[in-house]
């Protein structure tokens, strides 16, 4: 009630923040005259001066005004561009670990240089994150002269880069790369067998370009490094033959069955579910082809893998459409990014779904994969000490940014006011009428010599639109996943007078559409341009530029609404950059997927009430409101899915951090002899307790079982029964001591055969291999647990709480297994002397062989296949505080712990549990 009044009196939070930062802008401006007077060498020397001041205790916040003034002056001299005052505000926003929302054409790339330069002075590295390799290379090479002028180094990380190059790129002051490459390198680092094989340093500060695309759109997509599992191609082929025989079950809204079938499809949640008739029918067919034994159920424990194949086949046929979710190119299924329209070469769906699609398309089926390491972008980017981002559209997702990443969104005022006209949506009864209206609008714009950009949601729609225009004889360019190689060239000239470009979603994002075309691209296409040629190209461009402005600027046509308002705003934002004229219009029909699923009934009834005829359109605020309400509903559902994914992955993430910390500690340690000794003691005590229960009578002891177990686990034959017969004074504790002494004798003999140095090295490699193998199996077990945990809801149990409880038990078992299996291998192995260099070379060869078999996948997002989990009956997820990284001197495992508990380090913070 009072909020509008208070906002009027005091301004919004955003306005107050801008006012606060404007005071710092004035200080930066006050430095400008001083910086202009410096020579190039003096300006460059400022970088070393800043580093020295940081070393003496000065903070980055204290350096900010002067450092920004230096970066601004360097920008003028090297790039010919001076940062505007609003761009300085954007730079401060990034430095403070917030998201800067800036409209298209406001110079986000230039804004990033301010915060990147300031934070690179700390010497801890800055990562600039982009959505694709092209933008990473373009931005790095564009800004490299500026950074190098200031005495900083720049690196670029790319897929399939030689290790030495990649290591050098990460060691640079500023590193450019994609979100995928940073995430996969983090996982690779935690699979390395030597500290020298690791790439990344401490994750210090990241600036994410198009932050909404990476942290929101791709948040549901886990990053997975996998290795090949067993070949099941024949099974996929057999299942694929059966799926078309299943029919979809369709009901009207009132629940009346219009078509009885075997499965239902929920387009809202992208789920497919077999009903009772479907289960019976598929079981009969599987029995006929010999895949299921007579009388057996698909839900028997040993048949669950078969059930997974059936569901993978169903999803491949009913939820994944060619030229929408994927394309087929050169005999391969290439996934299409739903948010950018680009293909993702090398990325594969997991859980057998990719193989099912290959079977459906009649392609060669590649072997299944097993997860070796995984994480999500949500958890990876939260590892950075400081995180920030830039985008043209973040305000609609401000709540999610704050909830998940603790990032505030700051709307940066534009340098010039927006001059774009956004017309109301036009809604038609059918898609055919909608496309006819779009063609009419295109013709009108081309007649006025206006450039037009038509945005489509899928490749299929872009090709349909292209066919319609070809029939009309209208010249145009198509930009989708099939023609992505020409992306930069097409986008560069999309602003020419009368140019018509059709693009899927946000293809070309990150490249401005300049009115009149891009004269710099024209110059770049000439082999050795003369000053006269360049001057002529500029003059021609100026004429075209003025011609387009007088015609009304770029006109953006959208063929349908996206699920997210943000994606729609991104498309609109292609027009009206830097105060240019422009316009946008959305054309919709009741047959569009969003309208059909979420907004159809209300709008359809409204249109019927108006007595609309074929070919007529409705243009009303009520319709636009209904559509936006549907979009908010979808956004809310997607946020719930992403939040649920995070809550589940947070459990796995705490385990991941423990395992990776353990692994890094092992890699850094020169001698893990004490750790192995502790393992041996614990494993032995557990083994003895199983056969000689604590405080039990001798009659309850299973001596024969203990002798057998010691032979199996420790490779020693001990006459325990004979000891007991010969010595009446032997009791439980003294027996433990005697057994341990014998084990030490046996192990010391191994050390004598080789050498202490060789055995220590061998212990480390064995522990690393055991840890990696068991962690890989643990990930698989956790996946199975997560996919079935929602069924606990039927037993009135909270699935999330059950998942936490069971995953904790599994993790405890994992840690016990690591200790037990390590000791078992070390006890049985025969050690021989080997040259350390030969051993290291062999291990490196093994690691390279493993790397060659790795696949890098985007898994289908967990949480989509099952309904959202009920929160009732369970509390919020327990936050586990991470321990601070300590850089002080390493403690011996038998020394007192640094925390002051009075315990030995090995029993306190050095304990492996």
Curated annotation (Swiss-Prot):
Catalytic activity reported: ATP + H2O + cellular proteinSide 1 = ADP + phosphate + cellular proteinSide 2
Keywords on record: ATP-binding, Cell inner membrane, Cell membrane, Cytoplasm, Membrane, Metal-binding, Nucleotide-binding, Protein transport, Translocase, Translocation, Transport, Zinc
InterPro entries reported for this sequence: Helicase_ATP-bd, P-loop_NTPase, SEC_C_motif, SecA, SecA_DEAD, SecA_motor_DEAD, SecA_preprotein_X-link_dom, SecA_SF2_C
Domain of life: Bacteria
Primary localization class, coarse: membrane
One Gene Ontology molecular-function label: protein-exporting ATPase activity
Cofactor: Zn(2+)
Matching HAMAP family: SecA
PANTHER family: CHLOROPLAST PROTEIN-TRANSPORTING ATPASE, SECA INNER MEMBRANE COMPONENT OF SEC PROTEIN SECRETION SYSTEM
Subunit structure: Monomer and homodimer. Part of the essential Sec protein translocation apparatus which comprises SecA, SecYEG and auxiliary proteins SecDF-YajC and YidC.
Function: Part of the Sec protein translocase complex. Interacts with the SecYEG preprotein conducting channel. Has a central role in coupling the hydrolysis of ATP to the transfer of proteins into and across the cell membrane, serving both as a receptor for the preprotein-SecB complex and as an ATP-driven molecular motor driving the stepwise translocation of polypeptide chains across the membrane.
Name of the protein in its database record: Protein translocase subunit SecA
Biological source species: Pseudomonas syringae pv. syringae (strain B728a)
Gene field: secA
């Amino acid at each position: 009630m009072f909020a509008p009044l208070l906002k009027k009196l005091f301004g919004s939070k955003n306005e107050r923040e801008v006012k606060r930062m404007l005071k710092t802008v004035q200080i930066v401006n006050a430095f400008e005259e001083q910086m202009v007077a410096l020579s190039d060498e003096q300006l460059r020397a400022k970088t070393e001066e800043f580093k020295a001041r940081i070393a003496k205790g000065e903070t980055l916040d204290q350096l900010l005004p002067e450092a920004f003034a230096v970066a601004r002056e360097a920008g003028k001299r090297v790039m010919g561009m001076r940062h505007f005052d609003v761009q300085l505000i954007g730079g401060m926003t990034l430095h403070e670990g917030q998201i800067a929302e800036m409209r298209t054409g406001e110079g986000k790339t230039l804004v990033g240089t301010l915060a990147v330069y300031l934070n690179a002075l700390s010497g801890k590295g800055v990562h600039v994150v982009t959505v694709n390799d092209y933008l990473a290379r373009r931005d790095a090479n564009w800004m490299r002269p500026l950074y190098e002028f200031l005495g900083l180094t720049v690196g670029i990380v790319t897929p399939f880069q030689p290790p030495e190059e990649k290591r050098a790129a990460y060691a640079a002051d500023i590193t450019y790369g994609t979100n995928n490459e940073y995430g996969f390198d983090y996982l690779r680092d935690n699979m390395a067998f030597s500290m020298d094989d690791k790439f990344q340093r401490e994750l210090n500060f990241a600036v994410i370009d198009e932050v909404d695309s990476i942290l929101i759109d791709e948040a549901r997509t886990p990053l997975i490094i996998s290795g090949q599992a067993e070949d099941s191609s024949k099974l996929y082929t057999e299942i694929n033959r059966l799926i078309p025989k299943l029919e979809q079950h369709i009901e009207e809204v009132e629940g009346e069955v219009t078509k009885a079938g075997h499965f239902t499809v929920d387009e809202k949640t992208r789920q497919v579910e077999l009903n009772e008739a479907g289960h019976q029918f598929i079981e009969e067919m599987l029995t006929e082809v010999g895949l299921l034994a007579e009388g057996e159920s698909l839900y028997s424990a040993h048949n669950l893998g078969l059930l997974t194949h059936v569901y993978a086949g169903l999803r491949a046929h009913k939820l994944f459409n060619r030229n929408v979710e994927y394309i087929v190119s050169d005999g391969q299924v290439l996934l299409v990014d739903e948010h950018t329209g680009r293909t993702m070469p090398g990325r594969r769906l997991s859980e057998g779904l990719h193989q099912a699609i290959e079977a459906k398309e009649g392609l060669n089926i590649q072997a299944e994969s097993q997860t070796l390491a995984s994480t999500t972008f949500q958890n990876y980017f939260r590892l950075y000490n400081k995180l920030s981002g830039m985008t043209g559209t973040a305000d609609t997702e401000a709540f999610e940014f704050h909830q998940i990443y603790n990032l505030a969104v700051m709307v940066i005022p534009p340098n010039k006011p927006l001059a774009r006209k956004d017309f109301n949506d036009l809604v038609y009864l059918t898609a055919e009428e909608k496309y006819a209206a779009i063609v009419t609008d295109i013709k009108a714009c081309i007649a006025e010599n206006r450039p037009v950009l038509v945005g489509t949601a899928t490749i299929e729609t872009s090709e349909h639109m292209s066919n319609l225009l070809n029939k009309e004889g209208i010249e145009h360019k198509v930009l989708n996943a099939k023609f992505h190689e020409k992306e930069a060239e097409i986008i560069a000239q999309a602003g020419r007078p009368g140019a018509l470009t059709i693009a899927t979603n946000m293809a070309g994002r990150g490249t401005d559409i300049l009115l009149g075309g891009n004269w710099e691209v024209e110059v770049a296409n000439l082999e050795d341009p003369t000053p006269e040629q360049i001057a002529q190209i500029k003059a021609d461009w100026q004429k075209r530029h003025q011609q387009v402005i007088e015609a009304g600027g770029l006109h953006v046509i959208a063929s349908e609404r996206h699920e997210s308002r943000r994606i729609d705003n991104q498309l609109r934002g292609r027009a009206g950059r830097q105060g240019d004229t422009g316009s946008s219009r959305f054309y919709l029909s009741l047959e569009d997927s969003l309208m059909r699923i979420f907004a159809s009934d209300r709008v359809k009834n409204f249109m019927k009430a108006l007595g609309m005829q074929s070919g007529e359109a409705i243009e009303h605020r009520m319709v636009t409101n209904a559509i936006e309400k549907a979009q908010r509903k979808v956004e809310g559902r997607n946020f719930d899915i992403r939040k649920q994914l995070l809550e589940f992955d947070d459990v796995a993430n705490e385990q991941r951090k423990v395992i990776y910390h353990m692994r890094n500690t092992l890699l850094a340690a020169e001698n893990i002899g004490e750790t192995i000794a502790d393992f041996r003691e614990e494993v032995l005590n557990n083994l003895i307790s199983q056969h000689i229960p604590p405080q039990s009578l001798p009659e309850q002891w299973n001596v024969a079982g203990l002798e057998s177990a010691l032979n199996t686990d420790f490779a020693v034959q001990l006459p325990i029964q004979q000891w007991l017969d010969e010595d009446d004074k032997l009791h439980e504790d003294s027996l433990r001591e005697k057994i341990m002494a014998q084990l030490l004798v046996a192990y010391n003999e191994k050390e004598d055969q080789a050498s202490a140095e060789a055995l220590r090295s061998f212990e480390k490699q064995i522990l690393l291999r055991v840890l990696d193998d068991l962690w890989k199996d643990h990930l698989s077990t956790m996946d199975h647990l997560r996919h079935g945990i929602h069924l606990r809801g039927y037993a009135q149990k909270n699935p999330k709480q059950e998942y936490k409880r069971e995953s904790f038990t599994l993790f405890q078992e994992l840690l016990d297994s690591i200790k037990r299996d390590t000791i078992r291998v070390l006890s049985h192995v025969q050690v021989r002397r080997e040259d350390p260099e030969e051993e290291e070379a062999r291990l490196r060869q093994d690691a390279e062989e493993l790397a060659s078999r790795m696949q890098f996948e985007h898994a289908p997002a967990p949480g989509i296949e099952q309904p959202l989990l009920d929160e009732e009956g369970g509390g919020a997820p327990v936050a586990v505080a991470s321990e601070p990284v300590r850089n002080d001197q390493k403690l011996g495992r038998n020394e007192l712990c640094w925390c002051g508990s009075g315990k030995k380090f090995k029993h306190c913070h050095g304990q492996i549990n």
